[in-house]
């Protein structure tokens, strides 16, 4: 009986999606687990590719064309609503799962019933000017090391590196990964998932993690589980800014502008980060920490 379902939400990110799907079937310990893909408003061939490859990769996919995009957070909600297993492994379409990424997160739940959000350490290309060598939970490499774009990514080399890195390191950080983490399915639903207020992108992850902290959830990000994250290919570097690391998409610019105003209206103050660069809870507000679960 399956314990885990992996979910992926995507929008016009086909070449990266292909890698994400391949990594689940190639590298996850539970290679045959259910795999759910939500494809929203795609016109880049994603719909056709999913239809043509559903049997090859055993994908349960949903084609969603709408006038009000659910975006990254809403796509996560949509997928989790379809999950029938105890656990859900949420990744984004610009991620690659290293070997046993799922198993190492599942092991954190042995003999515990606490509300735990588990996340993989992330390895990313250094594509933003202020990217350091390391920030808690994320290791940065040069763009040339593994390949910063889908067409040049050296997955074999990365898998070898990630396996050795996990063997040599046993680090836990109190933190969660935006647009991708592992948890009990019911714990995601209990809190209400991502707030559709912030659709299609930006600030929804901070909002979710603050609400979770206020309700007593615990967080662990571990080096024993690894994800490669191309970084921001579904937000900054999309549409007219596709893979152009010198630009930021108009959708992302608008979302950031709009959602900071929505945030202030909802929470009253801007969020702060702790020493692990994890968003701090905001106390003393009238914000509803639990949202009504509406799924789709």
Question: What residue spans do the PLM features occupy?
Answer:
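Active-site-adjacent helix/loop segment of glycosyltransferases
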Residues: 7, 126-127, 132, 207-296
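Short, acidic, metal-binding catalytic loop of nucleotide-sugar glycosyltransferases
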Residues: 22-32
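Short aromatic/hydrophobic "clamp" motif used to bind/position activated sugar donors
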Residues: 88
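A conserved acidic beta->alpha catalytic loop
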Residues: 39-48, 66
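A recurrent flexible, glycine/aromatic-enriched loop bordering the glycosyltransferase active site
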Residues: 147-151, 158-183
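Glycine-rich, basic loop-to-helix element that forms the pyrophosphate-binding segment
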Residues: 66-83
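Donor nucleotide-sugar recognition loop
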Residues: 96, 174-180, 185, 189-228
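Conserved donor NDP-sugar-binding/catalytic core segment of glycosyltransferases
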Residues: 96, 100-149
């Amino acid at each position: 009986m399956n314990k885990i379902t992996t979910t992926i939400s995507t929008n016009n990110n086909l070449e990266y999606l292909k890698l994400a799907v391949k990594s689940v079937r190639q590298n996850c310990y539970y290679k045959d687990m259910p795999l759910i893909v939500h494809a929203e408003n795609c016109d880049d061939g994603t719909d056709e590719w999913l239809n043509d490859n559903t049997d090859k990769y055993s994908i349960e996919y949903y084609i969603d064309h709408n006038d009000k995009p659910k975006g990254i957070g809403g796509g996560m909600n949509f997928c989790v609503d379809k999950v029938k297993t105890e656990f859900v492994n949420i990744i984004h379409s610009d991620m690659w799962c290293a070997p046993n990424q799922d198993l190492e997160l599942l092991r954190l739940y042995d003999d515990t019933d606490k509300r735990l959000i588990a996340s993989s350490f992330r390895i990313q290309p250094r594509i933003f000017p202020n990217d350091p060598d390391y920030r808690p939970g994320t290791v940065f490499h040069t763009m040339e090391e593994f390949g910063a774009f889908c067409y040049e990514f050296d997955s074999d080399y990365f898998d070898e590196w990630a396996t050795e890195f996990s063997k040599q390191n046993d680090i836990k950080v109190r933190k969660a990964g935006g647009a991708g983490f592992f948890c009990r399915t019911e714990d995601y639903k209990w809190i209400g998932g991502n707030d559709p207020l912030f659709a299609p992108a930006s600030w929804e992850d901070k909002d979710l993690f603050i609400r979770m902290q206020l309700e007593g959830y615990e967080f662990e990000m571990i080096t024993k589980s690894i994800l490669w994250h191309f970084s921001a290919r579904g937000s900054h570097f999309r549409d007219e800014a596709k893979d152009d690391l010198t630009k930021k998409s108009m959708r992302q610019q608008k979302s950031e502008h709009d959602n900071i105003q929505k945030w202030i209206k909802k929470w009253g103050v801007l969020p702060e980060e702790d020493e692990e660069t994890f968003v701090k809870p905001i106390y003393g507000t009238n914000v509803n920490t639990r949202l009504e679960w509406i799924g789709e």
